[in-house]
């Protein structure tokens, strides 16, 4: 097995003490079988007490990726359950939130954190770009595709491929899939109806991510921000981007 994804891992057991004891033992067994196997936990909030090198390797990166990027680019909560105008386009708030949450990671954990825009638990990022509060039961399936803005999704993909962490594309996002939160976010792949332009854009950004090492393991620096814009850099000893 090359990797383990742990569902709500912090909730295992009846006490925090038991939880940590279990995951320490779990890591010993996993790494003995395969030293390179990754241990990836689903976790909301501060993960630092589990990321000390003897339990999890990293987490699904909600706090230092999915949530702040969604708030900044769309103003929406990741389930499409609310819109907050004070977040929308607020570059300074975005940087402050990101850097606070990134500080909870060890560097090696941040570099491999699972950076998603969408997944099986939350609304599709493209649907969030319509800035409509709702779910499948209240709005219906068709509304998930109304007034969406693919240009905002493309902005998000650029950030996904250049931000610290491991970019992880939820199936169909690259093809322009929409959907409200679970279960509507699990629609069938749109065979024959893919957005090929968007697919090619994803391929181009993935090539850039792979080509330049600074995007995979380089340092990060926020440079400037304003209303609906930000500027940041990635760099290592050989390259700045």
What is the predicted role of each segment?
Residues 23, 27-28, 36-182, 210, ...:
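Conserved alpha/beta catalytic core and glycan-binding cleft of carbohydrate-active enzymes
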Residues 12-21, 47-48:
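Acidic-and-aromatic substrate-binding clefts and catalytic sites of carbohydrate-active enzymes
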Residues 182-189:
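Acyl/amide activation-and-transfer machinery of modular secondary-metabolite enzymes
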Residues 13-14, 142-148, 189-196:
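Short, contiguous acidic/charged loop-to-helix segments that flank catalytic cores in large enzymes
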Residues 232-239:
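Active-site beta-strand termini and strand-to-loop segments that position acidic
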Residues 2, 34-36, 166, 210-219:
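Surface-exposed helix-capping loop/turn segments at secondary-structure junctions
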Residues 1-15:
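Active-site groove signature of glycoside hydrolases
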Residues 189-225, 238:
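Aromatic- and carboxylate-lined catalytic core of secreted/periplasmic carbohydrate-active enzymes
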């Amino acid at each position: 097995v090359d990797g383990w994804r742990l569902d709500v891992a912090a909730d295992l057991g009846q006490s925090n003490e038991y939880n940590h004891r279990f995951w320490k033992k779990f890591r010993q067994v996993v790494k003995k079988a395969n030293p390179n196997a990754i241990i990836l936990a689903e976790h909301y909030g501060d993960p630092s007490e589990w990321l000390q090198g003897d339990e999890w390797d990293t987490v699904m990166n909600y706090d230092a990726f999915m949530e702040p990027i969604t708030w900044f680019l769309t103003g929406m909560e990741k389930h499409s359950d609310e819109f907050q105008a004070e977040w929308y386009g607020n570059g300074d708030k975005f940087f402050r939130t990101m850097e606070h949450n990134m500080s909870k990671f060890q560097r090696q954990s941040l570099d491999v954190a699972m950076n998603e825009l969408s997944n099986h638990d939350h609304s599709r990022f493209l649907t969030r770009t319509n800035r409509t509060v709702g779910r499948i039961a209240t709005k219906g399936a068709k509304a998930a595709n109304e007034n969406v803005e693919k240009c905002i999704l493309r902005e998000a993909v650029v950030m996904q491929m250049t931000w610290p962490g491991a970019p992880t594309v939820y199936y169909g996002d690259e093809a322009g899939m929409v959907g409200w939160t679970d279960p509507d976010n699990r629609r069938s792949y749109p065979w024959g109806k893919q957005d090929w332009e968007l697919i090619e854009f994803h391929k181009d950004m993935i090539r850039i991510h792979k080509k330049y090492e600074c995007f995979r393991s380089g340092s990060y620096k926020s440079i400037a921000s304003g209303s609906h814009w930000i500027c940041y850099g990635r760099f290592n000893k050989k390259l700045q981007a």
